[in-house]
A protein has these predicted regions:
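Glycine-rich phosphate/dinucleotide-binding loop and adjoining beta-alpha-beta core of small-molecule
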Residues: 1-79
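N-terminal loops that bind phosphate or other acidic moieties
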Residues: 19, 72, 104-105, 129, ...
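Short acidic (Asp/Glu) and glycine-rich catalytic loops that position anionic groups and cofactors
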Residues: 27, 75-77, 94, 119-122
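Short, well-structured alpha-helical segments that form the helix of a local strand-helix-strand
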Residues: 43-52, 107-121, 136-144
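Short glycine/serine- and small hydrophobic-enriched flexible loop segments
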Residues: 95-103, 116-124, 145
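Charged C-terminal helix
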Residues: 122-152
Length: 152
């Protein structure tokens, strides 16, 4: 969140981000970068415009997180649940994506796979204990199960 806040306060820096950068804002963090949005459609359109202008990938976190490419493609992730809206969950997402990038996955694939696995781990955690009180470490604990589910 700190890096996104810095970018929001220094918007010119968005154009200096390295190729392959991925931003993972939630709706309010995105609005700090692009201005207030009237509805979710406008928010999505502004995120697409930002991804294109800054030549970055954006994962707009939410009920159905949107993965947006610099070319304007938009993919919606079907996994995840409201219990994942907890401190540290975005850090877990970042860690999953970075692990995929470190293995050589292309940026777009790492963003899509990482978002899916992260959400699936959250869904596994929800089934185990429910949404209320879910914390980031619950998602981490369920990552191996999520990977196993997609490999079967």
């Amino acid at each position: 969140a700190d890096a996104l806040n810095i970018l929001a306060n220094h918007r010119h820096a968005l154009t200096t981000l390295p190729k392959g950068s991925i931003l993972t804002p939630h709706p309010k963090e995105l609005e700090r970068m692009v201005g207030k949005c009237q509805n979710s459609y406008e928010r999505l359109m502004k995120a697409c415009e930002l991804a294109h202008t800054a030549k970055v990938h954006i994962i707009l976190k939410g009920a159905y997180s949107a993965i947006i490419t610099p070319e304007g493609k938009c993919f919606f992730n079907p996994t995840g649940n409201p219990g994942m809206a907890t401190g540290g969950s975005g850090d877990v997402l970042t860690g999953v994506i970075l692990a995929l990038l470190a293995q050589g996955y292309p940026t777009e694939e790492a963003a899509k796979i990482g978002t899916y696995i992260h959400g699936l781990a959250g869904d596994v955690a929800q089934k185990k204990q429910g949404m209320i009180g879910m914390i980031a470490s619950d998602i981490i604990t369920c990552l191996p199960t999520a990977w196993r589910l997609v490999s079967e």
